[in-house]
């Protein structure tokens, strides 16, 4: 039976020696969508809590036997239960993971590495989101292991509030990121002041 758990197991040097070839990147075993579009900031409306964050995100996938988009989605469906970071910023982390995994992976030994560096604008509904000046350094490994196959996700997200003008992230319903956000149950609501803006509730 497939199950998720946080494990000490990681992609160590001896595993790299055992499997010298990098696993294949995700194939088209599921819908492959283009990455989401960014919408330039023109005007922020309403009383939502607005924060500019300089983001550095990385997801390293360790899989000796290859991995698929379906497996990544399966792993992230239990994200709420295994997330070990600041709960006030879990929504931001979900957004970043979705955007990171929408990019192109770079092979690194037996691993595939997805990276993202952006300045993004996040809007939270009132009473939600991080405190003023709050920063995040989040690092966690989540694994999927059914005794026949092993896939490990090493996730790192760094977020600090900055004054560089960023971009709004938007939910493009045809994007791979949107599928991942749906799997992670990203909680949003439509802004009462702007029908094209989603506010984070977590």
UniProtKB/Swiss-Prot annotation:
Additional record remark: Most abundant protein in the virion.
Protein name: Matrix protein
Gene3D superfamilies registered for this protein in UniProt: Rhabdovirus matrix protein M2
Short sequence motif named PPXY motif, residue ranges: 35-38
Bilayer disposition of the protein: Peripheral membrane protein
Functional summary from the UniProt entry: Plays a major role in assembly and budding of virion. Completely covers the ribonucleoprotein coil and keep it in condensed bullet-shaped form. Inhibits viral transcription and stimulates replication. Plays a major role in early induction of TRAIL-mediated apoptosis in infected neurons.
Similarity comment: Belongs to the lyssavirus matrix protein family.
Primary subcellular site in the record, as a coarse category: virion
Source organism of the structure: Mokola virus
Domain description: Late-budding domains (L domains) are short sequence motifs essential for viral particle budding. They recruit proteins of the host ESCRT machinery (Endosomal Sorting Complex Required for Transport) or ESCRT-associated proteins. Matrix protein contains one L domain: a PPXY motif which potentially interacts with the WW domain 3 of NEDD4 E3 ubiquitin ligase (Potential).
GO molecular function: structural constituent of virion
Pfam families cross-referenced by the UniProt entry: Rhabdo_M2 (PF04785)
Gene Ontology CC: host cell endomembrane system; membrane; viral envelope; virion membrane
Self-association and partners: Homomultimer. Interacts with nucleoprotein and with the cytoplasmic domain of glycoprotein.
BP GO annotations: viral budding via host ESCRT complex
């Amino acid at each position: 039976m497939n199950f998720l758990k946080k494990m000490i197991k990681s992609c160590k040097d001896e595993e790299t020696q055992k499997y010298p070839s990098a696993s294949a990147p995700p194939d088209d075993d599921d819908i492959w969508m283009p990455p989401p579009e960014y919408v330039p900031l023109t005007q922020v409306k309403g009383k939502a809590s607005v924060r500019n964050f300089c983001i550095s995100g990385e997801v390293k996938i360790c899989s000796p036997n290859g991995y698929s988009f379906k497996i990544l989605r399966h792993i992230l469906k239990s994200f709420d239960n295994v997330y070990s970071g600041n709960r006030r910023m879990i929504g931001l982390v979900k957004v970043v993971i979705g955007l990171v995994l929408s990019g192109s992976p770079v092979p690194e030994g037996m691993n595939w590495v997805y990276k993202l560096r952006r300045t993004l604008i996040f809007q939270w509904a009132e009473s939600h989101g991080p405190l003023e000046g709050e920063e995040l350094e989040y690092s966690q490994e989540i694994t999927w292991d059914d005794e026949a196959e092993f896939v490990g996700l090493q996730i790192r997200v760094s977020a600090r509030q900055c004054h560089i003008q960023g971009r709004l992230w938007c939910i493009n319903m045809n994007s791979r990121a949107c599928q991942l956000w749906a799997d992670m149950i990203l909680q949003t609501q439509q802004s009462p002041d702007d029908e094209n803006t989603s506010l984070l509730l977590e």
